[in-house]
Amino acid sequence: MSPARNDKPFTLAGRTYASRLLVGTGKYKDLEETRQAIEASGAEIVTVAVRRTNIGQNPGEPNLLDVINPARYTILPNTAGCYTAEEAVRTCRLARELLDGHKLVKLEVLADQKTLFPNVIETLKAAEVLVKDGFDVMVYTSDDPIIARQLAEMGCIAVMPLAGLIGTGLGICNPYNLRIILEEATVPVLVDAGVGTASDATIAMELGCEAVLMNSAIAHAQDPVLMARAMKHAIEAGRLAWLAGRMPKKLYASASSPLEGLIR
């Protein structure tokens, strides 16, 4: 029997990936733990906060690229720590210089330090500039379906609505908005932020997300490497469940076995 839905490759900027789990590089105790967790996750795309992580801009300091080989992983520079469109654009251009013309970036422009909620006005400004400048923009945004639509129409190659606030581990706080975004999507939709454990990642994939990006859920686990393995399997399970199509929810019970031929 064929699945309820047809699977399709996970493709970004013309490149296809086997793993639908994207991982961050912050908050680990050291670079070796970072390397082990990323390897255990099976991820092929690794995101890096350019303003906080040395990828060559600080000679003489430990370089993340010494343990995360760009020949093996797609490096996804992000603009974490930026609070204006101008800061974000400048950071992306720096990343392009450091990574020899690399065009794939993750845009995030934050509103304040307490919530780390996206500033959608500044995000829209930055996205417009970056797209015109030739970047392939994956964009962190709120779970507002209208903003997600506008970002896609602007030319962003993927929209990444938050599931919960960054670093909170609250899980999928508003699955209904995510469903609307997914139903209207013309570009890949990835959950970004809020995942706390494997079941959260599975739920995101069961909703129909193309992939999930996470950092804190792995790095803050008591055993980050083991959690990375759990997330790998959670993503795969959620995707398979979405393809299979879940049974409908019912108010009343329905017997698993037919009444015909019942022994009396």
Curated annotation (Swiss-Prot):
1-deoxy-D-xylulose 5-phosphate binds at G167, A193, G194, N215, S216. It comes from the Bacteria. GO terms for biological process: thiamine diphosphate biosynthetic process. It catalyses: [ThiS sulfur-carrier protein]-C-terminal-Gly-aminoethanethioate + 2-iminoacetate + 1-deoxy-D-xylulose 5-phosphate = [ThiS sulfur-carrier protein]-C-terminal Gly-Gly + 2-[(2R,5Z)-2-carboxy-4-methylthiazol-5(2H)-ylidene]ethyl phosphate + 2 H2O + H(+). Signal peptide: none annotated. Keywords: Cytoplasm, Schiff base, Thiamine biosynthesis, Transferase. Coiled coil: none annotated. It is found in: Cytoplasm. Pathway: Cofactor biosynthesis; thiamine diphosphate biosynthesis. One of its GO terms (molecular function) is thiazole synthase activity. SUPFAM superfamilies: ThiG-like. CDD domains: ThiG. HAMAP family: ThiG. PANTHER family: THIAZOLE SYNTHASE (PTHR34266:SF2). Catalyzes the rearrangement of 1-deoxy-D-xylulose 5-phosphate (DXP) to produce the thiazole phosphate moiety of thiamine. Sulfur is provided by the thiocarboxylate moiety of the carrier protein ThiS. In vitro, sulfur can be provided by H(2)S. Homotetramer. Forms heterodimers with either ThiH or ThiS. This is Thiazole synthase. The lineage of its organism: Bacteria, Pseudomonadati, Pseudomonadota, Gammaproteobacteria, Pseudomonadales. The gene is thiG.
